[in-house]
């Protein structure tokens, strides 16, 4: 069965989310003990696992809430020390993607001309981008997935290895993958100010983690290939622009869509402001001009259609003033938990419909499949048949 956009509606609050996570972990233990993959019914249980980003009380032994103390004790007993440490680490910057957003991203990629190929999903969580992949794309694709969190990676294997997906439990920075060999890198990398675990002396080694993922992904795709990520608004709106200059030198920004602040509130329990960014790798590295413009930050005039505030101090990437139709909602100023100010995007409409309207306005057919080679023909037996699972 293919997962519907409403699949996670039952786990939008803390207690059901915790219970679904525990049920998924227990099922994973059973599958591993029995040495088998998940059935379609079991897949539905595993795919309700949404990580621990909004469930810090379950990880916090110092909580004074007696109900969460009991859940914390249950979780400590259920997980090994290594798994528990991995859960804590992943809770800091891992936000699972709503399926409605995943489906819109695949629609966008199809409109751009992507029909299948060699696909990489770094930081895959439990494979929600695989769950939302159209079967006509899956039928023509080979897929590699990378996930740092041990439990999430094992769940992805339990669900998708039977269909040929190759899953690596590793840092994206450390996993050995062939550069320049992928047609598409897609996903929702971690957000955060911390640097990557990159050991090589590359220009992007010290980028913040979400910007690093873009740079590494562009290293992985072939010229003409696509990178489509959900990312923190910091990629577009950070005052420091070194990462934007680097990304622009190796790829063209195809589109940027500012998502509403509540996009991740249900499945991930966070109101972080995010963007959908799609890049196409240039045929050769060049100090290209910013076309479209997206290098600098500018003040948002109160007269702008994207301004939802009387403040004259709102700043955003110049791209969104040139393309206000790509902002889903209106920008406003909000206080951070540390007493500072940030820009949020407020929207009260139908997000799925708004995304499809933006997708319909994207350019058509800019992606061209690579010419088939004898080596590619010999790999047909390895093509991922996710459509079998969907029947």
Task: Please give the residue ranges for each predicted region.
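Conserved Class I SAM-dependent methyltransferase catalytic core
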Residues: 148-150, 205-265, 272, 276-278
């Amino acid at each position: 069965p293919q997962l519907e956009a409403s699949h996670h509606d039952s786990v939008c609050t803390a207690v059901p989310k915790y219970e679904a996570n525990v049920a998924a972990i227990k099922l994973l233990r059973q599958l591993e003990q029995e040495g088998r993959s998940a059935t379609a019914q079991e897949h539905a249980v595993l795919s309700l696992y949404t990580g621990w980003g909004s469930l810090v009380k379950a990880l916090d032994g110092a909580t004074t809430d007696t109900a969460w103390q009991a859940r914390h004790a249950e979780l400590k007993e259920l997980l090994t020390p290594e798994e528990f440490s991995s859960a804590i680490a992943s809770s800091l910057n891992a936000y699972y993607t709503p399926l409605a957003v995943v489906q819109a991203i695949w629609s966008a990629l199809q409109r751009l001309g992507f029909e299948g190929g060699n696909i990489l999903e770094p930081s895959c969580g439990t494979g929600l981008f695989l769950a939302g992949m159209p079967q006509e794309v899956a039928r023509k694709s080979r897929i590699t997935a990378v996930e740092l969190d041990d439990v999430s990676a094992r769940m992805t294997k339990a669900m998708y290895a039977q269909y040929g997906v190759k899953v690596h439990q590793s840092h994206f920075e450390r996993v050995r993958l062939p550069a320049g060999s992928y047609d598409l890198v897609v996903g929702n990398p971690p957000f955060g100010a911390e640097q990557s675990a990159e050991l090589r002396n590359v220009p992007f080694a010290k980028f913040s983690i979400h910007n690093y993922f873009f740079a590494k992904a562009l290293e992985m795709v072939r010229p003409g290939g696509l990178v489509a990520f959900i990312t923190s608004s910091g990629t577009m709106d950070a005052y420091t622009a070194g990462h934007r200059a680097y990304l622009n030198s190796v790829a063209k920004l195809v589109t940027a869509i500012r998502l509403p602040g509540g996009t991740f509130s249900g499945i991930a329990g966070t109101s972080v402001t995010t963007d959908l960014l799609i890049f196409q790798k240039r045929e050769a590295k060049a100090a290209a001009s910013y076309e479209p413009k997206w290098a600098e930050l500018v003040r948002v005039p109160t007269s702008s259609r994207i301004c939802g505030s009387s403040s004259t101090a709102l700043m955003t990437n110049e791209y969104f003033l040139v393309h206000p139709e790509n902002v889903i909602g209106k920008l406003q100023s909000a206080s951070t938990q540390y007493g500072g100010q940030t820009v949020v995007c407020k929207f009260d409409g139908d997000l799925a419909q708004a995304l499809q309207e933006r997708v319909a306005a994207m350019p058509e057919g800019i992606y061209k499949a690579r010419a088939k080679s004898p080596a590619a023909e010999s790999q047909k037996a390895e093509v991922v048949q996710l459509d079998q699972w969907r029947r």
